[in-house]
Amino acid sequence: MCCFIVSILLRNVRTPMQVNDLPVFYSFRRCPYAIRARMVINYCGTAVELREVLLSNKPNAMLTASSKGTVPVLVLPGGTVLDESLDIIRWAFDQTSSDLNKLDIRLCGHLSQSGTNLIELNDGMFKQALDGYKYWQRSPEKPQHEHRSEAEQFLQQLEVLLGENQFLLSDQLSLVDIAIFPFIRQFAFVDKDWFDQSCYPLLQNWLEHFLDSELFLNTMAKYPVWNGSEETRNFINL
């Protein structure tokens, strides 16, 4: 735990940078894809201009950068656009110092096949079941508990892994944990009473570890919605 806290506090040494030269990061605070990208950006100490958006009123600048209309979106100073959270995560690690990369090589994107498979399951089957569980009223022909049962197939896999190690792949935090955590958080809070009484005690403890962590609490700091004005420009890790 001490090593984990110390590693969060490490920050990349960089030369002074004008704020207008910073990468622009479009985010929505509660989006799980945006949360995992912000967590890694904060973990690495990568400086960005954060533009908090409302998904119901997406800014034209974001839509011009990425026609997908989803967050997160990262616009680099040279004009390159990254609009997939895992690509943004890999970019953030590329910006860190060599010392930080050595310390956190397990996080830098060179995933084992088992780690890659877990993230693919999370972003595919589990996310689909999660959406059905959370927004079941959109398709009422399938009851909510059926969506939850489908999602539980993934929870069961995670519970088994946590029976072997403190985190999903080992006794050390990995990119896999950060990539999956925001989605388990979203699932749990659909019906927190049910989740807290479910047969996943190890997953419950794993979730609480992240919810109480300095990394997550800093990541979830509230910022004003960006409207193009100087007052709504936010800068993190400067």
Question: PLM features: what roles do these ranges have?
Answer:
Residues 45-47, 140, 187-195:
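Short helix-capping/linker segments at secondary-structure and domain boundaries
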Residues 146-150, 198-212:
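Extended, well-ordered alpha-helical scaffold segments
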Residues 2-3:
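Cysteine-centered motifs
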Residues 223-238:
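Acidic/histidine-enriched, glycine/proline-rich intrinsically disordered or flexible terminal extensions
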Residues 9-153, 159, 163-166:
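GST-like domain detector, emphasizing the conserved glutathione-binding G-site
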Residues 160-171, 215-220:
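Surface-exposed helix-capping loop/turn segments at secondary-structure junctions
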Residues 168-193, 210:
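GST superfamily/GST-like fold recognition
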Residues 106-108, 194-198:
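Structural helix-adjacent loops and short alpha-helical linkers that scaffold large soluble proteins
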